[in-house]
């Protein structure tokens, strides 16, 4: 049995300890081997572990923030695990393994904020569809729409997050020889569950709480994941070397009660081959002490996330009425609340990642070298797309208040929850109630659904690791590792977009056009990047004082990126313009070959009343030629114009560096203490961007300086 205790403290601001992370952890482990009695011929190894920690992040001592504000987040957890390994040594099974684990966390966070408003502030909490007018909070049930009186106030918001994860796995191994070849077969299954016992966002001060909707994590269903796999591992002698072949197949299944997708399932195959040309045995004095080559291919299927399978509800809040302000400086807003959620897509395909890799591993005079080239292609990558539903709602303007006989201070406003009609009554009862005139507005309402990107995403690169032979006189090891990486992504889906927050030109009516864009409503629909990074790690052991000192230098030698705007054939989607004030002053210049202002048009558009797609550019030119200013301005809102000349310029960022440092000291056999500091030299150097032709701080590319101390006690 072993016991250990650990204390960790990490501070992110060296000038003031106002933001710090602290954690106390204790662990207990038990291991036993049963090899007598009924287990004499088939020994059973049993292990049990229990770990718990208390701690979290706190900003309670910040002297520079607004007085009285603070935030803190708990990091409390308890984890348990067990393992049974039964060596059966039967002709049909070699050993059987059973593993299980449980992890429960308390990650509740709290934040106290300062707020102020010159007039009353409208707050929304409603989750049911309908029309609601703001009322003051008077305790008890929270109104769908309420207001906080003008002034200043503090509020504490909390998020109760208590996830529980359980896992159980069973694996059987069978090892046997086929001639001189060693064949190992592995069959296994695993099951895991995820659920949450927290209540989500809440406030004990609802009279001053900001806009939020109750979403109780504890009411969500449990996510069950079950998997099964089989793997065959064959080791075949080949001359002085050997060939290792591994083939495997895995099935994953996810089930969430109440999900429209029901049971989701997938199959993921893989194959590895390794040829050890020169094995390590007997070559300790040779120049090349080991040499092997390897290759692998596999396909990993990613099932949809919980958020896709059981989406969180969202809400669209439309202000449909604003009253006059009375002598107490209070006005009343009415809102139309539309609950929305990510919709079910019966045509959704599972995302697949196809991986290919070749590598070489060698040992030359004690220097271990590994070189790997890889290519990954992601198919059917997940994305959230949108389409627009045609909706109507009742809107009441403030024009109807001008001729109202009821004095402003005596007006009591009410709205019908289903029709949206606003009625004004007299608080004193002297004057009759009046119904305000209203209009029916037509508007597009966005709906979101999980979708697949039709164009694959390609990643490829080279990785290397060199572990130099140990410098015995200094007890020092040096490692150099790095990578060259290339990435290209191009969105080719035809997507809808409408600026629903805007108004139609020349009116106060909702905007009523939809644009259709290849890859989305932006200048670009993709990007490409190339990076070259390398790291040097030096680790020195000082046995006499039982100390380990480690320093790591991280370097970015190449960082290239470029924004893309093109279709599947390579034709450019964005257009260069000669005059930034005229989006129709099109030129024939390439967006990549010159520095110019650019504009992106939708391919087609449609209206609320007519869903037939129409050519956008032709309609824009016709509206300008005919002098239809309102239509021109409406169409203009669907175009995206750059305000800089370098939108599609190549961006090379100059090299930058960061250093990390750590020291670990053993104190007897009972304790160890570690100090670490990331970005140890607090690199604030300026780096150059060829795209913007400006210098910028390296702080946006490397981690902030932070340091910490860890104390471990072992029993």
Residue ranges with predicted function:
Residues 32-55, 71-260:
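Face-selective signature of the C-terminal outer-membrane beta-barrel domain
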Residues 99-101, 294, 319, 326-447:
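Membrane-embedded beta-barrel scaffold of Gram-negative outer-membrane proteins
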Residues 2, 34-46, 56, 89-96, ...:
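Repeated loop/turn-to-beta-strand initiation elements of outer-membrane beta-barrel proteins
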Residues 286, 378-380, 395, 555-642, ...:
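C-terminal beta-signal and adjacent terminal beta-strands/loops
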Residues 1, 7, 22-28, 76-82, ...:
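Hydrophobic, lipid-facing positions within transmembrane beta-strands of outer-membrane proteins
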Residues 219-368, 372-377:
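Structural signature of Gram-negative outer-membrane beta-barrels, strongest in the C-terminal barrel
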Residues 238-240, 394-579:
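Gram-negative outer-membrane beta-barrel transporters
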Residues 5-11, 50-56, 102-108, 191-197, ...:
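Transmembrane beta-strands of outer-membrane beta-barrel pores
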């Amino acid at each position: 049995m072993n016991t250990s205790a650990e204390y960790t403290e990490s501070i992110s601001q060296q000038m003031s300890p106002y933001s710090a992370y602290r954690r106390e952890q204790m662990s207990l482990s038990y291991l036993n081997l049963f090899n007598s009695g009924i287990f004499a011929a088939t020994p059973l190894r049993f292990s049990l572990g229990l770990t718990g920690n208390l701690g979290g992040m706190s900003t309670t001592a910040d002297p520079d923030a607004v007085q009285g504000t603070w935030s803190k987040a708990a990091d409390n957890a308890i984890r348990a695990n067990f393992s049974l390994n039964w060596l059966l040594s039967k002709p049909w099974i070699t050993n059987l393994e059973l593993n299980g684990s449980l992890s429960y966390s308390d990650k509740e966070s709290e934040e106290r904020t300062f707020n102020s408003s010159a007039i009353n502030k409208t707050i929304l909490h409603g989750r049911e569809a309908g029309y609601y007018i703001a009322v003051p909070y008077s305790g008890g049930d929270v109104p769908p729409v309420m207001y906080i009186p003008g002034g200043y106030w503090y509020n504490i918001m909390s998020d109760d997050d208590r996830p529980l994860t359980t896992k159980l796995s069973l694996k059987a191994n069978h090892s046997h020889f086929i001639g001189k070849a060693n064949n190992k077969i592995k069959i296994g299954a695993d099951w895991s569950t995820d659920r949450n016992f927290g209540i989500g966002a809440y406030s004990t001060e609802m009279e001053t709480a900001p806009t939020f909707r109750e979403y109780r994590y504890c009411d969500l269903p449990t996510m069950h994941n079950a998997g099964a796999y089989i793997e065959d591992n064959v080791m075949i002698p080949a001359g002085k070397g050997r060939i290792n072949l591994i083939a495997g197949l895995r099935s994953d299944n996810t089930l969430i009660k109440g999900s429209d997708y029901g049971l989701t399932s997938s199959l993921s195959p893989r194959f590895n081959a390794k040829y050890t040309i020169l094995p390590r045995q007997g070559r300790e004095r040779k120049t090349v002490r080991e040499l092997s080559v390897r290759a692998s291919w596999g396909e990993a299927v990613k099932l949809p996330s919980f958020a896709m399978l059981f989406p969180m509800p969202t809400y669209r809040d439309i202000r449909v009425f604003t009253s006059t302000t009375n002598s107490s400086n209070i006005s009343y807003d009415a809102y139309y609340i539309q609950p929305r959620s990510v919709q079910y897509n019966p045509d959704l395909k599972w995302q697949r990642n196809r991986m290919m890799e070749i590598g070489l591993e060698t040992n030359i005079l004690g220097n271990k070298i590994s070189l790997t080239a890889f290519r990954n292609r992601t198919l059917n990558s997940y994305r959230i797309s949108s389409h627009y539903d045609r909706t109507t709602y009742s809107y009441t303007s403030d024009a109807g208040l001008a001729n109202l006989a009821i004095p402003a201070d005596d007006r009591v406003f009410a709205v019908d929850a289903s029709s949206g009609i606003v009625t004004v009554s007299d608080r004193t009862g002297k004057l009759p109630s009046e119904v305000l005139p209203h209009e029916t507005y037509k508007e597009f309402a966005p709906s979101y659904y999980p979708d697949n990107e039709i164009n694959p995403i390609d990643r490829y690169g080279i990785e290397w690791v060199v572990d130099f032979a140990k410098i015995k006189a200094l007890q020092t090891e040096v490692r150099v590792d790095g990578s060259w990486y290339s990435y290209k992504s191009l969105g080719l889906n035809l997507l809808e977009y409408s600026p629903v927050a805007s108004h139609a030109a020349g009116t106060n009516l909702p905007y009523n056009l939809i644009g259709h864009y290849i890859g989305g409503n932006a200048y670009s629909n993709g990007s490409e990047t190339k990076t070259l990074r390398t790291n040097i790690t030096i680790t020195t052991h000082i046995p006499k004082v039982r100390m380990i000192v480690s320093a790591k230098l991280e370097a970015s030698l190449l960082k290239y990126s470029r924004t893309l705007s093109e279709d599947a054939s390579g034709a450019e989607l964005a257009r260069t313009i000669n005059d930034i004030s005229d989006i129709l002053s099109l030129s024939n210049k390439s967006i990549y070959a010159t520095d110019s202002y650019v504009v992106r048009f939708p391919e087609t558009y449609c209206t609320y009343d007519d869903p037939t797609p129409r050519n956008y550019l032709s309609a824009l030119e016709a509206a300008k030629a005919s002098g239809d200013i309102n239509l021109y301005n409406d169409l203009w809102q669907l175009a995206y114009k750059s305000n800089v000349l370098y939108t599609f310029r190549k961006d090379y960022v100059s090299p930058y560096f960061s250093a990390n440092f750590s020291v670990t000291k053993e104190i007897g056999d009972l304790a160890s203490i570690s100090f670490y500091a990331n970005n140890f030299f607090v690199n604030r150097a300026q780096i150059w961007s060829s795209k913007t032709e400006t210098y910028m701080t390296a702080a946006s590319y490397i981690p902030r300086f932070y340091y910490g101390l860890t104390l471990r006690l072992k029993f």
